[in-house]
Amino acid sequence: MARAYRLGEDLGTGAKCVKFLINLASTPSMAVVPTAVELCIQAAVDDPVGEARWQSWFDQWLLELQSAGAVELTLRLTDDAEIRRLNARFRGVDAPTDVLSFEFEADDTQALIAEEPLYLGDIVVSVPTATRQAREFGHTLEVELAWLAVHGLLHLLGWDHPDEQSWRAMVTQQARLLKGVNVVYDWPSVYPVG
């Protein structure tokens, strides 16, 4: 499939890309809706979660979000230097952040919709920032990475939080999705609204 990654040359330097296919059609609850998720994990830093856990999480999240059809996305685990560079380049903020999402943009939307798998975009997570936040918020790094990954996934699917109401709706959805993979995140006391 020909596509122009939003991050293009930014992804791939020194990173191993591990792809695996999640066949959601084999899941009993989705037997009627054939769905597959191709997840590409690029780890520029050590991956504290592991491929099997990422696979399980994205599998369950997209099942719960009732994603139909085949989709593909990239998860990039990186450091503060790289995410700071991306944040400055794409958001004009010269500082590291925890997670960035880059929805796939296509000139020909109809051609994109006809392709399978449908490429959703890229999620980039800073593991050092996630480590600091996990320590600050009093939970494990795995919990923080799950929170950030599902936040990025929701952005790829069109969710946003420009105001308090949309923020609350989005973090409520994140908490629900995390509960589905047995990850407990006490967001009301951890993240401020906004």
Curated annotation (Swiss-Prot):
Q: Which GO terms describe its biological process?
A: rRNA processing
Q: Which Gene3D superfamilies match?
A: Metalloproteases ('zincins'), catalytic domain
Q: What is this protein called?
A: Endoribonuclease YbeY
- Localization of this protein: Cytoplasm
Tell me the function of this protein. Answer: Single strand-specific metallo-endoribonuclease involved in late-stage 70S ribosome quality control and in maturation of the 3' terminus of the 16S rRNA.
Q: Which organism is it from?
A: Gloeobacter violaceus (strain ATCC 29082 / PCC 7421)
PROSITE patterns documented for this protein = UPF0054
Cofactor names: Zn(2+)
GO molecular function, one example? metalloendopeptidase activity
